[in-house]
Curated annotation (Swiss-Prot):
<keyword id="KW-0968">Cytoplasmic vesicle</keyword>
<dbReference type="InterPro" id="IPR000697">
    <property type="entry name" value="WH1/EVH1_dom"/>
</dbReference>
<keyword id="KW-0472">Membrane</keyword>
<comment type="function">
    <text>Negatively regulates Ras signaling pathways and downstream activation of MAP kinases.</text>
</comment>
<dbReference type="InterPro" id="IPR011993">
    <property type="entry name" value="PH-like_dom_sf"/>
</dbReference>
<dbReference type="Pfam" id="PF05210">
    <property type="entry name" value="Sprouty"/>
</dbReference>
<dbReference type="GO" id="GO:0030658">
    <property type="term" value="C:transport vesicle membrane"/>
</dbReference>
<dbReference type="GO" id="GO:0005886">
    <property type="term" value="C:plasma membrane"/>
</dbReference>
<feature type="region of interest" description="Disordered">
    <location>
        <begin position="121"/>
        <end position="170"/>
    </location>
</feature>
<feature type="compositionally biased region" description="Low complexity">
    <location>
        <begin position="146"/>
        <end position="155"/>
    </location>
</feature>
<keyword id="KW-1003">Cell membrane</keyword>
<feature type="domain" description="SPR">
    <location>
        <begin position="299"/>
        <end position="407"/>
    </location>
</feature>
<keyword id="KW-0963">Cytoplasm</keyword>
<feature type="domain" description="WH1">
    <location>
        <begin position="5"/>
        <end position="121"/>
    </location>
</feature>
<dbReference type="InterPro" id="IPR007875">
    <property type="entry name" value="Sprouty"/>
</dbReference>
<dbReference type="GO" id="GO:0009966">
    <property type="term" value="P:regulation of signal transduction"/>
</dbReference>
<feature type="domain" description="KBD">
    <location>
        <begin position="199"/>
        <end position="253"/>
    </location>
</feature>
Amino acid sequence: MSEEAPPEDDSYIVRVKAVVMSRDDSSGGWLPHEGGGLSRVGVSKVYPEGSGRSNFLIHGERLNDKLVLLECYLKKDLVYWKATPTFHHWLVDNRRFGLTFQSPADARAFDRGVRKAIEDLTEGSTTSSSTIHNEAELGDDDVFATSTDSSSNSSQKREPPVRTIASPLPGGHCRYSTLSNIDLPGFEHYPTEQSCARPHRHVSFPDDDDEIVRINPRERNWLTGYEDYRQAPIHRKYPDTESIDSYVRFAKSESTKHDYNYPYVDHTNFGISKDLKTSVINTQPSRCSSRRKDGERSRCIYCRDMFNHDENRRGQCQDAPDSVRNCIRRVSCMGFADCVLYHCMSDSEGDYTDACSCDTSDEKFCLRWMLLIPLSIIAPGMCCYLPLRACYNCGVMCGCCGGKHKAAG
């Protein structure tokens, strides 16, 4: 096996955090590869040695020990499954690979990145790196590697390098790497041009934009065997504020509210040392004054997408809890129909089409509806699902029903 250098940050089409999963043929399920752990997985454009055409590589590296867990070259005959909103797996050269994502938004972004790479392979496109990184084509600009990675703190911009790597294995383009611990000096750690300067007459409270890992309660029923591995430690990117000389002092008192004490210095005596404790201005900043500006966007805790507070209304978030939708499913006994379809018409991966789907391209379309007819006799409430669902869709279009985005924090 030839040892390959990891892809550069600028060569990635998409990059997310996920847990690399491997197929267990004995049990028919998926297990975390090499003991699990959160990894940084991305789709990068590479140039094989001695070939004028570019290939695309799925590269996964565990965060805690920098161990390469996944290296998979994409091919045109790749088969991709979206088993759940946070678990996707694919098949290439009779090898199966899987990823458990932290959020549905990360999963959708990775899916779009893979489809973009497959389209380029099919069309034989020689699109440059700047065209591939078009955020308008792929969306979810928070996970695409068009700028410095979120774990770094750099203000430098580098030109996308053209690299040369060894050709893939002749027996197949996909493999799980069992290399030992790889030391990558400088990888994802860029030098900082300037240190944190001491502010003058300005107080800023930086928001920690690290993604908070949350599990949708409705997804927990589907995730068995790998949902616990989505939990990941959150590392703060900012230094401890107690170690930095700041102009803000928090008064220690028994009051439940924080008093922000700003030292008042006389402009006429800047060169004279003076006890600042004798002249202090006690102010209480307005609540949520900076969170509700016109046109400000926030991240939803349910779907992890960015949304505008001014345009947020009912029906905007499909992942948000909705009491009306839950009531319709309970009244129409759709849980009973889903249970029967899962046991009778699911594939080897446990996937099945929605009970009332009208997609005629499904090979089991007629069989599914023939099964629903006797089920509606046993549970007559199922006959009410379609008219109730139609009324619900009208309510969503009018803004009367549906879930709303909720800002994180």
